[in-house]
Amino acid sequence: MSKEECPKAADNSFSSDKHAQLILAQMNKMRSGQHFCDVQLQVGKETFQVHRLVLAASSPYFAALFTGGMKESSKDVVQILGVEAGIFQLLLDFIYTGVVNIAVTNVQELIVAADMLQLTEVVNLCCDFLKGQIDPQNCIGLFQFSEQIACHDLLEFTENYIHVHFLEVHTGEEFLGLTKDQLIKILRSEELSIEDEYQVFLAAMQWILKDLGKRRKHVVEVLDPVRFPLLPSQRLLKYIEGVSDFNLRVALQTLLKEYCEVCKSPKENKFCSFLQTSKVRPRKKARKYLYAVGGYTRLQGGRWSDSRALSCVERFDTFSQYWTTVSSLHQARCGLGVAVVGGMVYAIGGEKDSMIFDCTECYDPVTKQWTTVASMNHPRCGLGVCVCYGAIYALGGWVGAEIGNTIERFDPDENKWEVVGSMAVSRYYFGCCEMQGLIYAVGGISNEGLELRSFEVYDPLSKRWSPLPPMGTRRAYLGVAALNDCIYAIGGWNETQDALHTVEKYSFEEEKWVEVASMKVPRAGMCAVTVNGLLYVSGGRSSSHDFLAPGTLDSVEVYNPHSDTWTEIGNMITSRCEGGVAVL
């Protein structure tokens, strides 16, 4: 073959995966045979013959030591302080082989030494080893250790583990050895996986009682993260009465009294704003229950007169994702309002067979029973209900021959309703929610029988209403909920379009309503509530066809604001419309 016929050599680069390993293995042999070693490292009573180049290439610590102009760079013998010889041997073996022997007995010393010598790979390997060893009995110790050595990756991992396994962790001996600040940091977390807030209170008290003499002075600080409005008052009082130490019992009684007074007598300050937004809301990872209360049910294709008011109550478990039945209301009712205060569920007003109620019932999740409490001053259905500053507000609604325009306030401690103001625009079957100490009223039906677009805000402190930009669509029988500093108006009904599946969101930053993803099913008279950063919509009624009465729905949809999508989850046991919903 002539030279001209030879194929032109391609300009390709090839690499060998084994090259680096072979070089490293050969350097380790040279170290073992003490060939070309150019420095001795004195660690304790041991001396190690090594190569400056290998160590400097493996660690910024040694690179600075040998090339940074330090006096050690020219010495034949360099002393390494702060490391035990056996641990240094393991680290030196890693530098020359890429392999390190990690065990339960040496991992803590190893990670400290590796961190000092800036051997990041060994630090990461030790962290991975410790993560694999973690359990509810040792996680507190690992948390404290990672905090001590400022290992942020391990600290974050152990914190998350403590949050997820809190119910097991807080019963262990290590938990009682936490410092005050460490305990408070844990108890403040939104990520605690708990059944209810009472477990956080018990964990805090358990820590205090372990060394009451020294820890008594920290009672206020340690209990500050506890969300007292979520605790059933009778259960809390019963615990306090059982405290044997007189001084501690008095301190707890005083603390509880002061807290209740602050919640009941709010001032326009940041502290009360904080109370509203954080203390009343269940923790993000707490086990939560959705209570679907009352309403009416009607089969698809049935007559208008076939609707039946419900007394049944269902509970949805956010952990198991199942619906179960709980104790029924004493009085079947639809068009009612539902609220949660002090760990209790309240069912307010409503109607059955054109009889409008002023009665209020209260459900205790501990005793699993409904009891009757004080009645409103005016019977009303299609009312708006929300909780603000530890009290229940009942707004507007239908009171018989006309729309009620009064606002009533219920004090759970005094078991008393009082009229505190009036609606700026009389309305019924509207949406209502609370956000940052203000009450918002959206849509509904007016005195003239028209579906409304209007949107207003009420300040319970000044007792004044202010108008806000109206919705794009007229909506009555809608669902309303606050989520991520926005207010959502969901579904509903108007005479022109019948049941709606569209959803609007009001952005306070942009001061306008925008449409977001529509529900999969048109709904009017549904219930809406926010849980763990998601929006849950349950029940309602569908559109009517051929003049037939619309059937009630048992389906449930969940809205994710980040993906702007709706997902269907498990259906309720009973289809229902114009009921109430609460989260506990």
Swiss-Prot record:
What tissues is it present in?
Expression seems confined to tissues derived from trophectoderm and primitive endoderm.
* Gene Ontology cellular-component annotations: cytoplasm; cytoskeleton
Q: Where in the cell is the protein located?
A: Cytoplasm, Cytoskeleton
The residue spans of each Kelch repeat are: 296-343, 344-390, 391-437, 439-485, 487-533, 535-583
Checking SMART domains in the record gives: BACK, BTB, Kelch
- Per the annotation, which location comes first and is thus the protein's main one? cytoplasm
Question: Is Transferase included in the keywords of this UniProt record?
Answer: no
Could you tell me what this protein does?
A: May play a role in organizing the actin cytoskeleton.
This chain's protein is named Actin-binding protein IPP
Q: Whose protein is this, by species?
A: Mus musculus
Highest lineage ranks of the organism? Eukaryota, Metazoa, Chordata, Craniata, Vertebrata
> What's the gene?
Ipp
